[in-house]
Amino acid sequence: MIVPDRHDPRTVGDATWAVHGGNAVDGGSGAIRTPIIMANAYLLPDDPSGIDWSNPEQLLYTRTTGANQQALEAKLAAMDGGAAAAVFASGVAALHGVFFCFLASGDHAIVSDVAYEATWRLFTELLPAKYGIEATFVDTSDLDAVRSALRPNTRLIHTEVIANPTTRVADISELAGIAHNAGAVL
């Protein structure tokens, strides 16, 4: 019999892990549940010259990161068995984060021809004009069309499942294989 350990996801159910995963005792209050911090700025030293402003773990200002955001990211990572997670203020912000993380000038992306309007605009207006990133729009449920759209500089395949409004469903597992074999991400 396995003894439940709230710090080990292999020993507890999903619901228990959703409650306990990613939690740590709060150093300031001793709370065993992550407190909600109602702050948008944090105390800085009198001489801020030693601050590493690019350190994503350092609590400086909530537009960069905050205690609540870090707690949510830790919980999501724990629930998914990942090393880390990132949360964004909106879906479009998340798309920007993914695309700018994996694409650079001269790269190519394959994008579902049925895409959220903001995704479409990113790949038809902003990314090609300002960053030199090209995109080919294809029916991502048609694996042969996806394979035909591959280029040596393809770095990303983006699909939406279930595509709205067509309700078209792409085969995620097959697309992941195509992307992996091409040295791209899905």
Sequence positions of predicted segments:
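N-terminal "arm"/small-domain region of PLP-dependent enzymes with the aminotransferase-like
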Residues: I2-G66, A74
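Conserved N-terminal alpha-helix of the aminotransferase class I/II PLP-enzyme fold
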Residues: A41-H96, A118-L126
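Short helix-loop-beta connector
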Residues: M79-A83, L103-G106, P152
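Conserved PLP-anchoring active-site segment centered on the Schiff-base-forming lysine
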Residues: C101-T119, V138-D139
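Short, small-residue-enriched loops and turns at beta-alpha junctions
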Residues: Y116-E117, L143-A145, I162-R168
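Catalytic PLP-binding core of fold-type I/II PLP enzymes
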Residues: R151, L156, V169-L186
